[in-house]
Amino acid sequence: DSRVKIVAVEHISNVLGLINPVKEIIQQAHKLNIPVLVDGAQGIVHADVDVQEMDCDFYVFSGHKIYAATGTGILYGRRELLEAMPPYMGGGDMVDTVSFAKTTYAELPLKFEAGTPHFIGQATLKPALEFAKWLKEGEIGKAVKEEEEKIIEYMTNALAQIEGCTLYGTAENKIPLFSFNIEGCFPSDLAQLLDKMGVAVRTGFMCCEPLMTRFGVTSMVRASFLPYNTLQEAEYFIKCLNRAVNMLR
């Protein structure tokens, strides 16, 4: 379709936990000369990310997803595309020359970094990226992957045993992230009870209201397991969830 100017796709769904075939999507888009932006907020945590092998035009993610400070993030983009893009914000250090007749902009990446940077937060990005990479390499990476597979199998089966529980996103190719609803239990009520038991979950639209509309719901409970979580913690979660459900019914 000639009206399509850019394709934006999640590497991994933040609601369903499903891993999208981004490389194939990129290949199809590039056949039509359409650039592709990949949202890597979940991908940077759970997947091996090689932007050159993926051949994406842009890859973005929040720093706090890999345990850096809040208010930080990464935007990777092809140089030729970034050079063609105008600055979206004005401020110090993003200009080269300024006159009444003409303004020229600084070289990349400065033209997109107007004003005083969040340098304290930025200092946390490098060690966070190194840590995220370490969690995916060698024996550590193998152990993390094996534990994630155990958690996925256990959680999928355990949630299926809860009466009235609907799990959204059950494809094999997924990460240990589980969004669900339980009949007779409002998501925010479950979240408050779980919080009292030391369990943190997310509820609401997850910034994906059209997807909620697709499933015919207004909210979900989301349990997201990270590389440092264990099968024992998944078992504790289910124990607490069953307790919360019994309190609400």
Predicted regions located by residue number:
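Pyridoxal 5′-phosphate
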Residues: 1-249
